[in-house]
Amino acid sequence: VKFDPQPAAARAAGIFVGVLCGAAAAFGWAAGFVAAKHGISIGFSPADLAFDRFFWTGLLLMPVAFRDGISNPGGIGWWRGLVMSVLAGPPQAMIAYSGFILVPLGHGTTIQPACATLFGLILATVVLRERATAMRVLGGATIIAGLIVFGAESLATIGHSGVGGDLLFVTAGLFWASFGTLLRYFRLSGTRATTVVAVLSVLVYTP
């Protein structure tokens, strides 16, 4: 029987692209955190930063979102779009940015992505019915251990306000994980969903 290497090659290429996209997203996320912390330190409020983050993008993408008509923005509908806008739009952003008022930059850049991953693992098992492999369980346990260390450090060095800041990042991570889970559950295009989030953020949040 002749062995066809194409499936293995295709899987390897897919893994490579996935890792590359993940690394690029992590870099972009980290850069965004640094910019947000700097903005907070020079006097911008979380609401100001959320406005600046979504307003210009929303204006630019508005023709794309409504090219199929105003009744079906981005092809995903109003109610799905509004839910996505809560989970990945200004509410999520303001929760995350508020955390930087209370705790150092390192807490946000670690806790929010870690919680997004942890809650993503949980939601994938509960909502998407994906199998909880031993590696996933081990990874989740490692994340929990790290979060406990961060929480203890906040309580010891910053006090209750530090724990409050950490919990804001935990909440922001939960929102982001829920957004990703719903993308999979509804089989939505990430590009379409992001476009609708930006546009509805302009229409609902900006006024």
Question: Where are the language model's segments positioned?
Answer:
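C-terminal ends of transmembrane helices
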Residues: 61-72, 119-132, 177-188
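Specific alpha-helical transmembrane segments that line the substrate/conduction pathway
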Residues: 48-59, 88, 97-131, 172
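Glycine-/small-residue-enriched transmembrane alpha-helix faces in small-molecule transporters
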Residues: 2-48, 145, 155-185, 203-204
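Cytoplasmic-side transmembrane-helix entry/capping segments in multi-pass membrane proteins
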Residues: 18-23, 76-85, 132-144, 166, ...
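Loop-to-transmembrane alpha-helix entry segments
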Residues: 110-113, 129-149, 159-166
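Specific transmembrane alpha-helical segments of multi-pass solute transporters/efflux pumps
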Residues: 28-33, 65-112, 121, 149
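Helix-helix packing/entry segments at the starts of transmembrane helices
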Residues: 26, 51-52, 93, 107-115, ...
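Hydrophobic transmembrane alpha-helices of multi-pass small-molecule transport proteins
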Residues: 61, 135-154, 198, 202-205
